[in-house]
């Protein structure tokens, strides 16, 4: 999993056709407060593993900070994006933590397909994520009427 520095140094100048998804673990502060920071670390680590297992070789997973991740898809057909993001959401939701009875995690995902500068797409994916987080454990794709 790449980190924010990688994103800032290598991906900020990305231009062309690509798809960006922003992922945010739901209720992460509650996990830390209820189960402890080791459980929070386990949640982050296993979520990253589940996401990594669900994406294709060449797609890029970045832990942007805290409980936020970015996914950069190259050559992801627009009509396949929702299905892919839903499979990632389900993979995270189905994680088990036998060492922390009762711990369940979910993720909210906002995605945007774009042709153009990365910065514009980050804003669009962030808007979609905002709408996904309003209900938690959802996947929302950017469209003009989200504004």
Regions found by a protein language model. Name each.
Residues 20-22, 111, 141:
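Core hydrophobic beta-sheet residues of small sensory/regulatory alpha/beta domains
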């Amino acid at each position: 999993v790449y980190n924010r520095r990688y994103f800032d140094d290598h991906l900020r100048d990305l231009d062309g056709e690509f798809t960006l998804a922003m992922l945010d673990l739901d209720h992460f502060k509650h996990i830390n407060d209820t189960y402890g920071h080791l459980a929070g670390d386990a949640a982050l680590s296993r979520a990253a593993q589940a996401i990594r297992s669900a994406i294709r070789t060449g797609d890029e997973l970045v832990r942007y900070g805290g409980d936020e991740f970015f996914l950069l898809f190259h050559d992801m057909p627009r009509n396949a994006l929702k299905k892919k993001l839903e499979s990632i959401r389900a993979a995270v939701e189905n994680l088990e933590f036998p060492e922390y009875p009762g711990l369940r995690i979910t993720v909210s995902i906002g995605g945007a397909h774009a042709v153009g500068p990365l910065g514009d797409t980050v804003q669009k994916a962030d808007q979609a994520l905002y709408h996904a987080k309003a209900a938690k454990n959802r996947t929302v794709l950017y469209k003009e009427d989200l504004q």
